[in-house]
Each structure stands twice: as C-alpha cells, then as structure tokens.
C-alpha cells in the first residue's frame, strides 16, 4: 500500500471513531437525570466508564439524592454465609389502606460472614453505613459497596465495649462512638471515618457517669439511633434506665388502646402520653406474630413477622391518621429464593435483622 493511500485509510478510520464516539456521547444533564433514577450499584458501574460521569456521581448534590430514597434492608446469617436483601418502600397515598404486592428487589447478594463478629447490630443504618463488633474491635459495613472495614480497638484496657455509629451533619462525616459496657464511665472514644488520621481514637468527656444498657433479645439489645447529629441510646445511671428525647411504645395488656409516652423536654423531663387504636384493630396477627422494628420518616410504625417462612410481609401503621398498609414482597423467602441460595424449603428463615430506613451510599471505606 502506498504511503498516501495508507494515510487516507488512517484518516477515514479516525473519522469513523470520532463519529462513533460522538454518537455515544450523552449530555451531562441527561446523564445526571438517568443516574438519579438508578440504584447505587448501577451508578458505581457507570462511574467507571468515563471521567466526566465520575464527576457527576461524586458531586454532593448527587450523593445527597439517595437520602430521599429510604429502603428496607434486612440480612441474616446461615452457616458461614451472610445474606443481604434490599427492598423499596412502596408508593402509597397517605390514607390508603390496601394490600400491595411488589416483585422489585433493589439488591440481593450473599457474602462470606466476617469471622468472629457479633451478629447483632446496636445502631440503625446511619446515612448508609452500619456498625458491627468483632469482640472489642468495631467493624463498619457499607451494604451498597459490599465492604467491611475493621477498626482498631478503642482502648486496650477495655475488656468489653459497646459501639455506636453517628453522623455529623455539619462536617458531613460518620463518627464511631465506643464506651465500656461492663462499668460506668464518663468517657467515650470517638473515631471520625474518612479523616486523615482515621485510625486514631480521641477521648471525649460525657456529662454523666453511665454505661449503655446491655438489653436483651426482647428489646433488640438496646439499639441506638442518630437524629440530627445526636445519639440516643438506652443507658443506666444509678440502676435507672434512661433514654433521650425519644418515645416508648407500650405493648402491655391494654386491649382498648396502644399507649405511647414521648419525652417532650429533655432538660425538664416532661412526658406526654398518647393513646392510639390497639394493634388488633388493624390486624389481629400484630399482637403475637409480628414485631415492631422501627418507624418511617413519615411517622409510620413498621411491623415484620417474627418468623419468615414462605411469604415476606411488612405492615405499615400510621397511628395518627389511623391508616394500615400491608405490603407483600415477592422473590423474598419464597421457594425460588430458597432454591437459588440452598436454604431448604421446609424451615423458616431465622435471626433476620432489619434496618428500616436504610439509604444507599457510594462512600468508600
């Protein structure tokens, strides 16, 4: 081939590549709109394709968009396997009381279970992250990125400890809080995730000498919740159990009402009592076969079955509006799910733990 002919051929090939590249180019505003509609796991794949797409998915306005899409995440352990499932919350009108069936599962996977880890969590999902323990060493988990990050022991002298996870809305950082649970203390250790010195724990004084309540299986081991940057958890001071600005929901033998006590003023310790319709008004199974796992951002109580066998149901109750919604999720705990994962068809799924207001996050640990 002559040099001139070879040069012309190369120019033609370059034009074709340029034309092909331009035909595949997507304007940033359209790409952003598409990404905002996708689950986080799909966004991660696309962000690796082009640098300008990666700049979209790492922008604060984009990552914050996941906060408006809370989902129900649940997980359980079977032998040495760790199963994780995320399902969306259905779109329901405020006063709608109907049954829903959904076949949409946002994410479902299994991974080897972290060795020697305490399976019970003591904090809800906090801006997409969940905290575990491995003996006296905390473990932070990002379910979206499927990553576990072990942390150093906060204090070598502590024989046992409790860890909580919080989020600072001003600094936009997650913070792990640890304190001894076998003795009262007026100190805690705090580690800021993503900081330059991420492996360093700092000591912070508390207002009271106390220790977190160990709880039991009935009250889910004294869970903690982070609200507007403040941690609320069950604790004991002088043998009295205290709780922050929170609410106690009664499940006593009150047949005609469901009592709730709300701490209105933290400093004055003023409590208000509210009485709602009993659970049996909505569904008789709620009294004995379902358990309360949390509350939505809209104030709905969330109930799930004590034992999941073939059908996975979630009940949402708004005690103020007096509405009831039953949601049935297909593809979860049914025959197909069990066969695919080798879980057997004749035994219930046990030890399921729930995170009712989980949001996805692309945060790297």
From Swiss-Prot:
Ranges for domain F-box come to 20-69
Instruction: Report the InterPro entries cross-referenced here.
Output: F-box-assoc_dom_typ3 (IPR013187), F-box-assoc_interact_dom (IPR017451), F-box-like_dom_sf (IPR036047), F-box_dom (IPR001810)
Gene3D superfamilies, per the entry: 1.20.1280.50
Q: Which Pfam families match?
A: F-box, FBA_3
Membrane-spanning intervals of the chain: none
Where are the coiled-coil regions?
none
UniProt-annotated stretches for the region Disordered? 1-20
Which domain of life does this protein belong to? Answer: Eukaryota
- Quote the protein name from its UniProt record: F-box protein At1g48060
């Amino acid at each position: 081939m002559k040099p001139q002919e070879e040069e012309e051929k190369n120019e033609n090939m370059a034009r074709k590549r340029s034309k092909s590249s331009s035909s595949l180019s997507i304007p940033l505003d359209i790409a952003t709109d598409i990404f905002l509609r996708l689950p986080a796991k799909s966004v991660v794949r696309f962000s690796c394709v082009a640098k300008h797409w990666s700049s979209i998915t790492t922008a604060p306005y984009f990552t914050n968009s996941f906060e408006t899409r809370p989902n129900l995440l649940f997980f359980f352990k079977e032998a040495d396997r760790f199963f994780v499932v995320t399902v969306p919350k259905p779109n329901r009108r405020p006063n709608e009381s109907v049954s829903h069936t959904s076949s949409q599962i946002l994410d479902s996977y299994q991974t080897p279970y972290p060795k020697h880890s305490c399976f019970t969590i003591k904090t809800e999902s906090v801006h997409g992250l969940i905290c575990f323990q491995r003996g006296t060493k905390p473990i932070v988990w990002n379910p979206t990125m499927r990553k576990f990050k072990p942390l150093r022991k906060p204090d070598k002298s502590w024989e046992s400890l409790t860890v909580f996870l919080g989020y600072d809305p001003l600094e936009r950082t997650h913070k792990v809080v640890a304190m001894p649970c076998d003795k009262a203390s007026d100190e805690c250790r705090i580690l800021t995730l993503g900081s330059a010195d991420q492996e360093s724990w700092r000591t912070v004084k508390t207002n009271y000498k106390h220790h977190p309540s160990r709880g039991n299986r009935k009250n889910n081991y004294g869970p903690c919740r982070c609200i507007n940057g403040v941690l609320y958890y069950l604790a004991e001071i002088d043998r009295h159990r205290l709780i922050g600005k929170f609410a106690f929901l009664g499940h006593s033998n009150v047949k005609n009402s469901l009592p709730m006590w709300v701490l209105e003023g933290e400093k004055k310790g003023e409590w208000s009592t509210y009485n709602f319709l009993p659970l049996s008004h909505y569904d008789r199974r709620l009294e004995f076969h379902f358990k309360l796992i949390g509350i939505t951002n809209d104030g709905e109580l969330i109930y799930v079955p004590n034992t999941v066998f073939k059908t996975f149901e979630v009940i949402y109750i708004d005690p103020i509006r007096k509405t009831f919604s039953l949601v049935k999720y297909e593809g979860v705990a049914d025959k197909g799910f069990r066969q695919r994962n080798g879980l057997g068809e004749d035994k219930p799924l046990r030890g399921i733990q729930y995170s009712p207001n989980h949001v996805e996050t692309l945060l790297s640990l």
